[in-house]
Structure formats: C-alpha cells, structure tokens
C-alpha cells in the first residue's frame, strides 16, 4: 500500500492523501519523500490550481512516526535535509491554493501541515 496517494482531477485539483490509517497517518521518511515529490509535481504541472490534503482513516495525521526515531539520521544530517527539502517552506510558498481537510488527530507535523495551508476545514 502506498503511504501517500496522489491524483489530479479534471478541474485541476490535486488530492494528496496520507495513507497509513493503521498508524494514524504518522509521517515517516518515505511519506516525507513522497510529499516533497508531489509538492514539486503540483508546482510543475500548470493545470494544477489547488491542492487538497486529507488523511485516510480516523485521523488526519498523528505527527511524526516515532518508530523511526531510533534510526533517525544525525542532527546535522537532519538539519541539512530540512534545509535542502523544506516541506513547510515549499507549502507556504506554493503557487497553488492549499487546503487541509482535517479530522481526528492532528498532532505535531499533523498540525504543522494544515497551518502551512491557505485554508483548513
């Protein structure tokens, strides 16, 4: 199962779905990489006018996946990765309208993502 789903409809609305419902959509490194790819794709595809974020299951996003904390990169590597691929900066400065459809748990990164969006529902 893909941890993040991506689609674009005929109206130019991209939907990015956090798809780890058993883990309450906690964001792991694979999801972070996919979110970056999909943000960039939405920026490059001229037909995309809006991006809607949603979470599958009973939570929007419970934050970072703490099961990966023990295998996390060093502090310097983490800072470099955040600088090179800053998801929140990309979202705050995206050319498209961004909307978070929030429900259930929204903690940590699961609250940061909606706060970076233009609209929260």
What do these predicted regions represent?
Residues 1-56:
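Conserved CoA-thioester-binding segment of acyl-CoA-metabolizing enzymes
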Residues 5-7, 89-92:
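Short secondary-structure boundary/capping segments
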Residues 16, 53, 65, 113-115:
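Hydrophobic/aromatic residues within transmembrane alpha-helices
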Residues 19, 25, 57, 63, ...:
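Conserved phosphate-binding and hydrolysis motifs of nucleotide-dependent enzymes
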Residues 26-29, 62, 71, 116:
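Phosphate-coordinating loops and pocket residues in cytosolic domains that bind phosphorylated ligands
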Residues 31-34, 83, 113:
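Hydrophobic alpha-helical membrane-association signature
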Residues 47, 55-90, 106:
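Glycine- (often His-adjacent) and acidic-residue-rich active-site loop
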Residues 90-121:
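Glycine-rich beta-to-alpha active-site loop
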